[in-house]
Design a protein with these regions (language model features):
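Structural preference for solvent-exposed beta-strand-turn elements
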Residues: 1-363
């Protein structure tokens, strides 16, 4: 069994497929890659044991072919090839790779000494009979990866807040910060795992079909399919309370240059010590937003672009959280709402963020 294809095409496919590997040493399959040619359609498959990534290409010459290889070794070898074409040939328990030279990759075996067969959960998933079908845009997915991802809970494995709440809107939170994007994707809300959302970034087609059935969700576009399980715990997700916070009215608001405030925070960060717990003072003055380190060794005022219902207000806020949330914005100018004792709100188009203030004895 042998296949031959353009080196550039195989490199492109492998560079995408490798992103589906989690390389968990406790779960060997997460470090493997399936290579399958059926009816001239080549498919590379990888998994993290929950999500499966399929990268496909049609019109590939060769006999039907199926093999499972060590993903890292295969990926690194293919990336270093400079020949015009690459040939893959299965001989016994080895995969021959011919390009600039001839290389033999030893193939993994199961407990009975047979070549490993890669599971394919798509075989039992019938797109025609799924409960719900939707279509989303790749640009929307990439917007969510930019603005919502930084607000996910990354410190509590298994928490429902590690996932994206996707329904009438898209929400992410770690209880200290919230991000809500006013885009309706699904009629019935689900929690999408962060690993699955990350895999969608390898897609290149703008239109993506989404198929949801019980605890399974599949994203499919030209040449790429992502199969996985929804994150459990949606009944524990306090979406009503979170949405209420996003909709809070603040007495005052202003707008500032995104670049100007980020540059000021970057300079001020040099004067924030470990005992400050990343806290800085943010004061809304008549001239602009004053940013001050706790020891007053660094201070800077970012001028307003606009200001409405001004009233001087001071709070302590985590500089890392503030920087991360502002960096996620796309527009050059951001609107900041303030005046409540517990948090501030940042608005950028259809994106709303809430950042909780830090407790401080001086305030």
């Amino acid at each position: 069994m042998k296949i031959t294809l353009k080196t550039e095409k195989l490199q492109e496919m492998v560079s995408k497929a490798i992103k589906g590997c989690s390389n968990d040493k406790q779960i060997p399959i997460t470090g493997l890659m399936s290579i399958d040619l059926t009816d001239h359609r080549l498919t590379l498959t990888t998994t993290d044991a929950i999500n499966y990534l399929y990268i496909s290409e049609d019109k590939i010459d060769g006999e039907d072919f199926s093999v499972v290889v060590p993903a890292e070794t295969f990926s690194k070898l293919i990336s270093k090839m400079t020949s015009e074409n690459i040939s893959l040939a299965l001989t016994g328990n080895e995969l021959g790779v011919d390009g600039n030279g001839h290389y033999r990759i030893e193939l993994p075996l199961d407990e009975e000494g047979e070549l490993i067969k890669f599971p394919n959960p798509l075989d039992s998933f019938d797109i025609k009979t799924v409960a719900a079908k939707y279509e989303v845009n790749l640009t929307t997915i990439r917007q969510l990866l930019t603005v919502n991802k930084p607000a996910l809970d990354t410190n509590n494995d298994g928490s429902c807040y590690t996932g994206y709440y996707v329904g009438e809107s898209v929400v992410s939170t770690d209880s200290y910060k919230i991000c809500g994007t006013g885009i309706k994707l699904f009629d019935e809300p689900i929690l999408i795992r962060p690993e699955m959302m990350d895999l969608l970034d390898v897609m290149t087609s703008e239109k993506i079909g989404v198929y949801v059935d019980n605890d399974t969700v599949v994203f499919a576009s030209e040449g790429c399919v992502v199969y996985g399980k929804v994150l459990e715990g949606i009944s524990d997700y306090k979406i009503d309370a979170i949405s209420g916070l996003l909709e809070l009215d603040f007495p005052s608001e202003c707008s500032v240059s995104k670049d100007a405030i980020l540059q000021a925070l970057d300079r001020l960060a040099l004067f924030v010590g470990q005992y400050d717990k990343n806290g800085i003072y943010i004061t809304f003055t008549k001239d602009g937003i004053s940013l001050t380190s706790k020891k007053s060794s660094g201070a800077e005022v970012v001028p307003y672009k606009t200001s409405n219902n001004f009233k001087e207000f001071t709070a302590c806020i985590n500089i890392d959280m503030l920087q991360t949330q502002i960096k996620a914005h796309v527009l050059d100018e951001i609107k900041i709402c303030y005046g409540l004792d517990n948090a501030l709100k940042i608005i950028d188009g259809n994106v709303t963020q809430i950042i909780a203030y830090e407790e401080d004895d001086r305030l």
